[in-house]
């Protein structure tokens, strides 16, 4: 059961990284 927890944590970290990159790379979407 520990493997599932580790995978979940890893997935969360990757998702956070992807979100950060997506929000940081294209600043044209949030152009005010």
Swiss-Prot record:
One of its GO terms (cellular component) is plasma membrane-derived thylakoid membrane. The chain crosses the membrane at residues 8-23. The keyword Transmembrane helix applies. It holds the Pfam family PsbT. Residues 24-32 are cytoplasmic. The keyword Thylakoid applies. Keywords: Membrane, Photosynthesis, Photosystem II, Thylakoid, Transmembrane, Transmembrane helix. Residues 1-7 are lumenal. The modification Blocked amino end (Met) is found at residue 1. It is found in: Cellular thylakoid membrane. GO terms for biological process: photosynthesis. It comes from the Bacteria. Signal peptide: none annotated. PSII binds multiple chlorophylls, carotenoids and specific lipids. It is a single-pass membrane protein. Its main location: membrane. HAMAP family: PSII_PsbT. Seems to play a role in the dimerization of photosystem II (PSII). PSII is a light-driven water plastoquinone oxidoreductase, using light energy to abstract electrons from H(2)O, generating a proton gradient subsequently used for ATP formation. PSII is composed of 1 copy each of membrane proteins PsbA, PsbB, PsbC, PsbD, PsbE, PsbF, PsbH, PsbI, PsbJ, PsbK, PsbL, PsbM, PsbT, PsbX, PsbY, PsbZ, Psb30/Ycf12, peripheral proteins PsbO, CyanoQ (PsbQ), PsbU, PsbV and a large number of cofactors. It forms dimeric complexes. Belongs to the PsbT family. This is Photosystem II reaction center protein T.
């Amino acid at each position: 059961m520990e493997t599932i927890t580790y995978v979940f944590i890893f997935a969360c970290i990757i998702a956070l990284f992807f979100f950060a990159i997506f929000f940081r790379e294209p600043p044209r979407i949030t152009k005010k």
